[in-house]
Amino acid sequence: MSSSSPTSSGKPLKLRIDRDNEGYLSLVTDTGEVYRCPICGNDRFVYNYERGEIVCIVCGAVVQEQLLDLGPEWRAFTSEEKGQRARTGAPLTRLISEALTTVIDWRDKDVSGKELDIKRKLEVIRLRKWQTRARVQTSYERNFIQAAQELERLRSSMGVPRPCVEQALEIYRQALEKELVRGRSVEAMAAAALYMACRMMKMPRPLDELVRYTKASRREVARCYRLLLRELNVKVPISDPVLYISRIAEQLKLSGEVVKTAIEILQKAKKAGITAGKDPAGLAAAAVYIASLLHGDNRTQKDFAVAAGVTEVTVRNRYKELAKTLNIKVPVK
């Protein structure tokens, strides 16, 4: 993948995008030089799928934006090859291919909202029944489509990037093939698959936040997640608290200096060995809270707890641990 980025002279600079083993991006110029952030000099970046931007992991500066490739992924050198390789009508995502088409509404009303007469109601009921039969043939398909619809609902409610949802759908498919879904609710299994997918793609969401948007309980989702880990033999990277910082800062509209300070606090905490076994979202919220205080932004712990999807108690406890262990002199409000 390649794109262009403005330079100090105003001319576009062609960059090649590479990804390392940890999932971070590095940018290389057409001359083979490593591109560095013009603000802080860092050479590692992350991709924001929601905005189509490449962002510096240290200062939060956007170094590239509007990365949207509308061309085909294949190359053709003759008109015959182009005709053979061109295709139309293929699904854009797994969600669309899994029968997420329009359905006849369960409300017996017309387009203007008026109740249908009895004759039309009976006709709609009959059509609805035939549509269900035509779309779904087996219990496997019914279960899978129900999960796809639940994942699409979670994506819309939580603002989860679509690639995470597609990965979650693939995880659910594997669970369904191994009959892990039997005896468990579709909502809990779909939520667990989405939680796993977000972590796999280094865009983690707190479990407590996810549970708020599903009918399943936290205990049920956590149990299904452990089952998926054990039975599918999936390697899920340990959540880095740093990955939560940009989302918290974006919700609270914090400055790049606050983000940079929060990352430095977490890096020191890792070296001190106080991050192991702690909720990464809570650690990130506490680090951003401390960084905000150091930069004169006196918001409440509740603001940071809500943005991170954790409780105030968690933020307070992690804040005390970080400040005490790292000997940070936090200004009193």
UniProtKB/Swiss-Prot annotation:
UniProt GO BP: transcription preinitiation complex assembly
Record gene name: tfb
Family (UniProt): Belongs to the TFIIB family.
UniProt keywords, alphabetically: Metal-binding, Repeat, Transcription, Transcription regulation, Zinc, Zinc-finger
Recorded GO CC terms: transcription preinitiation complex
Annotated Pfam families: TFIIB (PF00382), Zn_Ribbon_TF (PF08271)
The Sequence repeat ranges on this chain: 149-232, 243-324
Originating species: Pyrobaculum islandicum (strain DSM 4184 / JCM 9189 / GEO3)
Domain of life: Archaea
CDD domains cross-referenced by the UniProt entry: CYCLIN_TFIIB_archaea_like_rpt1, CYCLIN_TFIIB_archaea_like_rpt2
Keyword Transcription regulation: yes
Alphabetized HAMAP family for the sequence: TF2B_arch
Name of the protein: Transcription initiation factor IIB
Record: residues binding Zn(2+): 37, 40, 56, 59
